[in-house]
Amino acid sequence: MALKKIIVSVTNDLTCDQRVDRVCRTLSGMGFGVLLAGRRLPGSLPPGHRPYATLRMHLLFRKGPLFYAEYNLRLFFLLLNRQPDLLLANDLDTLAANRLAGKILRIPVIYDSHEYFTEVPELTHRPRVKKTWEWLEKRVVPGVAAAYTVCQSIAD
């Protein structure tokens, strides 16, 4: 029987995200074929040896709405082309592409909300941007197969 393939997606450059690395190592140790997809930044260090595959996309935009639009569009096509058995979206900023691809491929999407994304300090004094993320959250979170977070206060 072939390995079940999981694609884990993040918007960072993979090198310093120890929590996601632990999740990927655990999944790999359980026998899953894991691909961690993120982005490459100028000056990004190599991801180093890992017991799972990594892929870093070079994006034209580094921040703002064009970054999120480009990232999610490219991630969406990556997810469709790789034909995984399961998708794991880390944070709200990766969830739109995962939910759409999951719906088309008819596979489950797991949502890792390790922070309350719409309450991060970067959005505190930006009400329009915060409203946009809240609008997206209301539309994409309800359709996930499962979700988890790091603490009870975020789950509540």
Outline where the language-model segments fall.
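Active-site proximal beta-strand in glycosyltransferases
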Residues: G102-V120, Y148
